[in-house]
């Protein structure tokens, strides 16, 4: 359970964590769960997170993303990502595993490319909170990945955790700016 969460948030998110963010680990794999509080409506945050074809909107380290010409955002579709230089990766082919607009859940697997994240799977969920006429969002992102040969669990987790945390921080920055710029706090949505 991420330490960034309040007791109320933890209590409300318990079922979602059990359903979407808990993994059966094989020997040689590790997982982690991160939370990000965002001062923007969940509809706005979801409009950014759900765009499998535009991860660079909020994900650091992505130079470009391409999809097939007649791309339809549906489970099973793929994207090809080119990673910025300086990381232990060049390219990544990723498959959309889940996209549930009603429950605001999305997830993908890395299925190819030049990188060290073998069997990487990620799930992201977007949650609405309201208290004293304030609305905010908590985003949970978890992953499971095989540890590369020669790397410890701590090494693997440190690298993946850093990337996930930076992406969630950028998501908060982007969504909060969009909400502020809309004037009414509702934000516009990514199209």
From Swiss-Prot:
Binding site for abscisate: 59, 89-94, 116-122, 141
InterPro entries in the record: Plant_def-hormone_signal (IPR050279), Polyketide_cyclase/dehydratase (IPR019587), START-like_dom_sf (IPR023393)
Domain of life per record: Eukaryota
Compartment(s) of residence: Cytoplasm; Cytoplasm, Cytosol; Nucleus; Cell membrane
Annotated site, Involved in interactions with PP2Cs, chain positions: 88, 152
One cellular component term from this protein's GO annotations in UniProt: plant-type vacuole membrane
GO biological process: abscisic acid-activated signaling pathway; positive regulation of response to water deprivation
Ranges spanned by the short sequence motif Latch loop, renumbered to the chain: 115-117
Molecular function per GO: abscisic acid binding; identical protein binding; protein homodimerization activity; protein phosphatase inhibitor activity; signaling receptor activity; ubiquitin-like protein ligase binding
Post-translational modification: Ubiquitynated and degraded by the proteasome upon binding to the E3 ubiquitin-protein ligase RSL1 at the plasma membrane. Phosphorylated by CARK1 especially in response to abscisic acid (ABA); this phosphorylation promotes its stability and inhibitory ability to ABI1.
Outcome of mutating residue 78 to A: Reduced CARK1-mediated phosphorylation
Subunit and interaction comment: Homodimer. Binds ABA on one subunit only. Interacts with HAB1, AHG3, ABI1 and ABI2 when complexed to ABA, and possibly with other PP2Cs. Binds to CARs protein in an ABA-independent manner, both at the plasma membrane and in the nucleus. Interacts directly with CAR1 and CAR4. Interacts with CARK1 in the cytosol. Interacts with AIP1 in an abscisic acid-dependent manner. Interacts with FREE1 (via N-terminus). Interacts with the E3 ubiquitin-protein ligase RSL1 at the plasma membrane.
Domains as described in the record: Upon interaction with ABA, the 'latch' and 'gate' loops change in conformation leading to a tight dimerization and the creation a surface that enables the receptor to dock into and inhibit the PP2C active site.
Similarity comment text for this entry: Belongs to the PYR/PYL/RCAR abscisic acid intracellular receptor family.
Protein's name in the database: Abscisic acid receptor PYR1
Organism per entry: Arabidopsis thaliana (Mouse-ear cress)
Gene behind this protein: PYR1
């Amino acid at each position: 359970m991420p330490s960034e969460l309040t007791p109320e948030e933890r209590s409300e998110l318990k079922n979602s964590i059990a359903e979407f963010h808990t993994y059966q680990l094989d020997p040689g794999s590790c997982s982690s769960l991160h939370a990000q509080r965002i001062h923007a409506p969940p509809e706005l945050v979801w409009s950014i997170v759900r765009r499998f074809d535009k991860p660079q909107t909020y994900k650091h380290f992505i130079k470009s993303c391409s999809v097939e010409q007649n791309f339809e955002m549906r489970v099973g579709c793929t994207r090809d990502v080119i990673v910025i230089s300086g990381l232990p990766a060049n390219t990544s082919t990723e498959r959309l595993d889940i996209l549930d607009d009603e429950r605001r859940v999305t997830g993908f697997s890395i299925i190819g490319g030049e990188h060290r994240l073998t069997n990487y799977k990620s799930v992201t969920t977007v949650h609405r909170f309201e208290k004293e006429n304030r609305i905010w969002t908590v985003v949970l992102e978890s992953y499971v990945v095989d540890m590369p040969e020669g790397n410890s669990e701590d090494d693997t987790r440190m690298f993946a955790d850093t990337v996930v945390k930076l992406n969630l921080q950028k998501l908060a920055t982007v969504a909060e700016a969009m909400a502020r710029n809309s004037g009414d706090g509702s934000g516009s949505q990514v199209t």
